[in-house]
């Protein structure tokens, strides 16, 4: 056993002997004084152990580290019989209720391990923000006996910190970790309450211990980590912000969320990410990108916009979604073939469906009656079937490479009135292009039509002429090269002769 551990052991024995010694206590005042002295001794012993721990977190021989055990303090409310008492009572810091004035300063700037140890010695609860300096040179942040932080824990722009732990920490405001390039492990096993988790640019963070105790949190932002799972938030049902991005090893993401009141964003994680949001009912804004599979079976209401961009999934099922109060976008989903929006009746923003190369038909809105913004359809689809659509308040731009697409439904309105009320309709297919101008009542004000077949023929003639011109240029090219070479040779000869003569 190392010398310092031997000394610590005998120091502990001495303290215990003091408590176990038969003591005659005549008054409550003397009894409290004795217990306060014992608490002071144990506090200094704890500080001594923490100082050693900050410099040697594990034994050189790899054995168990006794410094990881909690130091138990003497209960100042305990009663000591005058003669019969032979044992003593110890309690954990969890029975403490009073907060020292030194623990209510509002801001604690930690420059080194000594600052942190001093704070722990005084405070089981900290009222204010704890900010770890970018100059903090230790590899370990240990919150020790601190149980509550009525404020934020902020650690940013540090290249030394390897591990952050707080075995007794139960609650805090915001946990902000940003640009910690050596940070690997976070261990808060007792954490139950946190207002915001904001983790960014933690490129080698791979281990987090929170144990799923958190049930209430406002914001979850996890960006640019090496995490393979974030299942420690699975008991959370409602958040304001849920933003998971650029976690390159995250292949599965299950969230038991039922409501997101501001923004839900998942993008740029592992290419094969499977996203399970099966319990989600309502969301304000949602953007999903770079996902291989998605489950949204219970989503019924989107209070703003809904976007699916550059995903790999082949099917998208939202059978309960009735209303989107903003824009609905389906963009650059190369494998998307099957969609189900069977209950959607109202999109109050625009409807954008573009560059989904496997999508042959736009026929998955059987009940859609109204679009509050514009229509933008582009791709290789050959059919548009929106049987219940009665009103589009914006313009319509439709372009397909398929020659089978018929634009008549949009460009030849029944009874002379179009369902498009936004001023302009433009529809292009492999057969023809049509453009209409309409007023707010849907009355056609002007029409223009272009036959793309004739355009192709004209392009063909121009192409032939261009081709002939290029042949002439190709035939004349060798002659031009020969002439240029002859001129250069003559110039070189005259240059040499001139230099010899003069």
UniProtKB/Swiss-Prot annotation:
Membrane topology per record: Lipid-anchor; GPI-anchor
Glycosylation site list: 77, 135, 285, 303, 340, 343, 355
GO BP annotation list: ascospore wall assembly
Domain of life: Eukaryota
InterPro entries with a match to the protein in the record: CWI-Assembly_Regulator, Rcpt_L-dom_sf
Alphabetic keyword roster: Cell membrane, Glycoprotein, GPI-anchor, Lipoprotein, Meiosis, Membrane, Signal, Sporulation
Signal sequence bounds: 1-56
Lipid-conjugated positions (GPI-anchor amidated asparagine): 475
UniProt entry tagged with the keyword Repeat: no
Propeptide section residues: 476-502
Subcellular location: Cell membrane
Bias (Basic and acidic residues): 448-461
Further details from the record: Present with 238 molecules/cell in log phase SD medium.
Its job: Involved in middle stages of meiosis. Redundant with SPS22 for the organization of the beta-glucan layer of the spore wall.
UniProt similarity note: Belongs to the SPS2 family.
Record's protein name: Sporulation-specific protein 2
Organism, as annotated: Saccharomyces cerevisiae (strain ATCC 204508 / S288c)
């Amino acid at each position: 056993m190392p010398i310092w551990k031997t000394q610590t052991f005998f120091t502990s024995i001495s303290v215990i002997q003091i408590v176990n010694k038969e003591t005659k206590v005549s008054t409550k005042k003397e009894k409290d004084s004795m217990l306060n002295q014992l608490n002071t001794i144990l506090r200094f012993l704890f500080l001594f152990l923490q100082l050693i721990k900050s410099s040697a977190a594990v034994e050189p021989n790899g054995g168990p580290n006794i410094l990881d055990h909690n130091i138990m303090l003497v209960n100042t409310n305990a009663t000591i019989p005058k003669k019969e008492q032979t044992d003593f009572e110890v309690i954990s810091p969890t029975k403490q209720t009073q907060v020292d004035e030194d623990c209510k300063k509002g801001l604690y700037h930690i420059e080194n391990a000594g600052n942190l140890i001093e704070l722990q010695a005084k405070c089981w609860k900290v009222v204010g923000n704890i900010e770890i300096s970018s100059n903090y040179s230790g590899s370990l942040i240990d919150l020790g006996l601190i149980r509550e932080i009525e404020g934020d824990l902020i650690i940013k722009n540090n290249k030394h910190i390897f591990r952050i732990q707080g075995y007794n920490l139960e609650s805090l405001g915001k946990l902000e970790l940003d640009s910690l390039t050596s940070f690997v492990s976070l261990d808060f096993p007792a954490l139950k309450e946190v207002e915001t988790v904001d983790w960014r640019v933690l490129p080698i963070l791979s281990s987090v211990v929170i144990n799923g105790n958190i049930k209430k949190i406002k914001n979850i932002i996890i960006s640019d980590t090496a995490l393979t799972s974030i299942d420690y938030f699975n008991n959370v049902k409602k958040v304001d912000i849920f933003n998971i991005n650029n976690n390159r090893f995250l292949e599965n993401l299950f969230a038991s969320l039922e409501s997101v009141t501001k923004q839900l964003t998942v993008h740029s994680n592992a290419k094969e990410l499977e996203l399970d949001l099966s319990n989600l009912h309502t969301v304000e804004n949602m953007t999903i990108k770079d996902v291989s599979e998605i489950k949204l079976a219970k989503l019924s209401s989107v209070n703003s916009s809904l976007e699916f961009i550059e995903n790999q999934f082949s099917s998208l099922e939202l059978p309960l979604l009735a209303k989107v109060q903003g824009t609905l976008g389906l963009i650059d989903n190369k494998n998307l073939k099957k969609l189900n929006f069977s209950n959607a009746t109202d999109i109050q923003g625009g409807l954008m469906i573009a560059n989904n190369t496997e999508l042959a038909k736009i026929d998955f809105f059987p009940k859609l009656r109204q679009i509050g913004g514009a229509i933008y359809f582009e791709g290789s689809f050959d059919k548009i079937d929106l049987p219940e659509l009665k009103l589009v308040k914006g313009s319509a731009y439709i372009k397909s490479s398929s020659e089978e697409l018929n634009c008549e439904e949009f460009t030849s309105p029944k009874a002379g009135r179009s369902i498009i009320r936004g001023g302009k309709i433009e529809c292009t297919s492999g057969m023809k292009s049509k453009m209409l101008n309409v007023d707010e009542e849907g009355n056609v004000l002007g029409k223009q039509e272009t036959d793309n077949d004739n355009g192709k023929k004209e392009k063909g003639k121009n192409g032939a002429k261009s081709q002939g011109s290029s042949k002439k240029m190709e035939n004349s090219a060798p002659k031009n090269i020969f002439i240029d070479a002859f001129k250069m040779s003559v110039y070189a000869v005259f240059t040499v002769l001139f230099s010899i003569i003069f």
